[in-house]
Amino acid sequence: MDNVQFEQGCTLFFSIMENVQLILSPLEAHNAEQRYRVVKRSIDARQRELKVLLTILVDEKGHKVEREAPIPLYEPPHFQDVHHAERTAIIIGAGPAGLFAALTLLEHGIRPIVYERGKEVSARKVDIARLNRNLGLNPESNYCFGEGGAGTFSDGKLFSRSKKRGNMQRVMELFHYFGAKDNVLYEAHAHIGSDKLPSIIRAMRECIIAHGGEIHFETCVDKSLFHNLSTPSLRGAGESHPPIILSIGHSAHDTYRMLLEEGVALEPKGFAMGVRVEHPQSLINQLMYHNQPQEVIDLVGNASYSLVTQVQGRGVYSFCMCPGGHIVPAGSSAESCVVNGMSASHRNSPYANSGMVVEIRPEDVRAEAYMYGSGIDTLEFQEWLEHEAFLHGGTDNQAPAQRLRDFVEGRLSRDLPACSYLPGVVSSRLDEWLPAHIGLRLQQGFRDFERKYPGFLTNEAVILGVESRSSSAVRIPRAPETLQSVSTPNLYPCGEGAGYAGGITSSALDGINAALKIAEKYNL
C-alpha cells in the first residue's frame, strides 16, 4: 500500500470509528485489554474500590474492535533518504530533543549531523554499571551524558505536565514505531522502563544513519562552532552556516559557560531541588490503594503517587516517582553527590522512591551568593549544594541519608533502613545542612503529605541528598516565533538544557518543533 492509499485508508477508518469509555474493576479491565483495542487507560484510586477507566474503540455498528484487528494504529513516519541532501542541520546532543529533531529533519529531507559528548548506549551501560559498583565516574558517560540523554537510564516515563503546543501523541507513536509496547499509545501515565529504552534509542540511531544522517559519539563541540555561527558575514543572503539545534541537556554546565563566553544569551530560571525519599513499596500500595489484596495489585501494578503542597509561598512536590524502582547516582562531575530514580519495565523492586523538591526562584539564592561564588546564581547554587552533599556523604558516591521522621523532627538517624541505592548511604543531618529555604519547606511539606496519607511520614522511609537535576537552572532565551536564540541567529536552543522542557516527552516535542522551524526556514 502506498502512502496515498494508506492516508486515505486512515481517513476512512477513523471517520467511521468511535470511542466508548468503560468503568471496570481491575479484573474486568485486564480481560478487556487482552481482547479489545484500547485507546486510553487510567486508574481511579480515589475510592476504596479501585476502578479502571478504559476507552475502547468501536465500529460504526457499536461493536468493540478486537485487539488483533488488521487496522492501523497510526500513520507510520516517512523518512527520506538524505545521503545526498543539500540541506543539513547540526544537532548538539543526542537526548530526546536531539534524536526527535533528527528524525523530524529526515521526514523533511534535511540531513542531520549529530554530535554527542557521551558514548553510544551499549558502552554507556558499561560505564553506568561501573559507577553503581563504586568503580569510578566517567564524567562524559554516566546517567546524564550519552546516547538517549538523561532519560535513558532514569525510568523512561512518557507523560508530561506540559501544556505546550504540539503533537504529543506523535511522540508516543514514534516511540512505539521504534519498539515500545502498545500500552505507550494509551496509558495515561505511560512508562517504558530503563531496561527497555536503550534498545529503542539504538533503533532510532540506526534509522538516522541508514537514511543518511550522521551521529558522532564522544565528541564535544568547542567554541569555534558558535563563533562561526555568529560571524556577521554568515547572516547575509549568501552561503550560510548550517543551523544548529542546541539540545545539550540540563547537566552540561561547561557548555553553558562556553556559550556565555561566546556571547550567547543565558539567564537564570526557576528550578527545584530537594531530596529523594524511598518507602517500602508495600506501604505505598497500602496508602494509595486502600489495602487492596495482592491479586488486585498484580492486575493494576504497583502504586505511584503525585503530591504537591504550598509552603511559605513556594511549591513542594513529588517529582519522577518510581514505583518498584531504584535510587541511582546521577552526578556528572567529581566531588558532587546527585541522586535520581529509575524503574525497570516491570516495576517490581520492593522499593518506591520519588524526588521531593522545593520550588526555587532566582531571588531565593542571590542572598547566599557569597557562599558559592559568582556567575549564574542558580547554576552556581546548584553546584555548591551538590558539593555539600558530597562532603556530608561518604567516599565512592555514598549518599548522605536520614530516616524520614528523623529529618522532620530534627535528629540524627542512629541506623538506616535497607535502601536500593547501590553505592551505599551514610547517616547525616540533612535537616541541618540543607539551606533553610529548602530544608524547612521540605519538613513542612512532609507533614502536609502525612495529613493527606496517614502513614507516609514514617521512619521506615529514608531520604537521600540531593535531588538537584529535576530541571535546568538556566534558560537560553529564544524568540517565540522562530525558536532561534535571541542573541545568536541560526541557533535553536531546545529541550531541558535550554530551559523549555522537563522530561522525555516535552523534550522530544521541543526538538520536533525546532526541526519544523528549520524546515519552514528552508521552505520544505
What are these regions (language model features)?
Residues F6-F153, K157-L524:
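Residues forming the flavin
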